């Protein structure tokens, strides 16, 4: 399992506004153990994602 910021089709992090429930639901939908809104980046962070999950590694958001 891996931890990280889930990304969308355009390699952009999932934005949140301090909404932990939104991120937890999003992450669990991606088969993670849990998730929360990381305040410094206003992005969802998932813990316990499957190894093949798409997370932010490098490259710019293409949107």
Swiss-Prot record:
Single biological process term from Gene Ontology: defense response
Listed InterPro entries: LCN-type_CS_alpha_beta_dom, Scorpion_toxin-like, Scorpion_toxin-like_sf, Scorpion_toxinL, Scorpion_toxinL/defensin
A Pfam family per the record: Toxin_3
Domain notes: Has the structural arrangement of an alpha-helix connected to antiparallel beta-sheets by disulfide bonds (CS-alpha/beta).
UniProt miscellaneous comment: Negative results: does not affect Cav1.2/CACNA1C, Cav2.1/CACNA1A, Cav2.2/CACNA1B, and Cav2.3/CACNA1E calcium channels.
Keywords: Calcium channel impairing toxin, Disulfide bond, Ion channel impairing toxin, Neurotoxin, Secreted, Toxin, Voltage-gated calcium channel impairing toxin, Voltage-gated sodium channel impairing toxin
Organism: Parabuthus transvaalicus
LCN-type CS-alpha/beta domain: residues covered: 2-62
Signal peptide location: none
Family statement drawn from the similarity comment of this UniProt entry: Belongs to the long (4 C-C) scorpion toxin superfamily. Sodium channel inhibitor family. Alpha subfamily.
Subcellular location, principal: secreted
Protein's UniProt keywords contain Nucleotide-binding: no
Disulfide bonds listed in the record: 12-61, 16-37, 23-44, 27-46
GO MF, one example: sodium channel inhibitor activity
Subcellular location(s) per record: Secreted
Role, per record: This neurotoxin acts on sodium and calcium channels. It acts on Nav1.2/SCN2A and Nav1.5/SCN5A sodium channels and slows their inactivation. Also binds to Cav3.1/CACNA1G, Cav3.2/CACNA1H and Cav3.3/CACNA1I T-type calcium channels with high affinity and inhibits the channels by modifying voltage-dependent gating. Also targets neuronal high-threshold calcium channels, including P-type, N-type, and L-type calcium channels (Cav), and others that still are unidentified pharmacologically.
Protein name: Kurtoxin
Tissue occurrence: Expressed by the venom gland.
Record bears the keyword Membrane: no
């Amino acid at each position: 399992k891996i931890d990280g910021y889930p990304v969308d089709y355009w390699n952009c992090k999932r934005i949140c506004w301090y909404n932990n429930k939104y991120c937890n639901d999003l992450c669990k939908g991606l088969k993670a153990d849990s998730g929360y809104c990381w305040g410094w980046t206003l992005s969802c962070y998932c813990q316990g994602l499957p190894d093949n999950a798409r997370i932010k590694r490098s490259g710019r958001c293409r949107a």
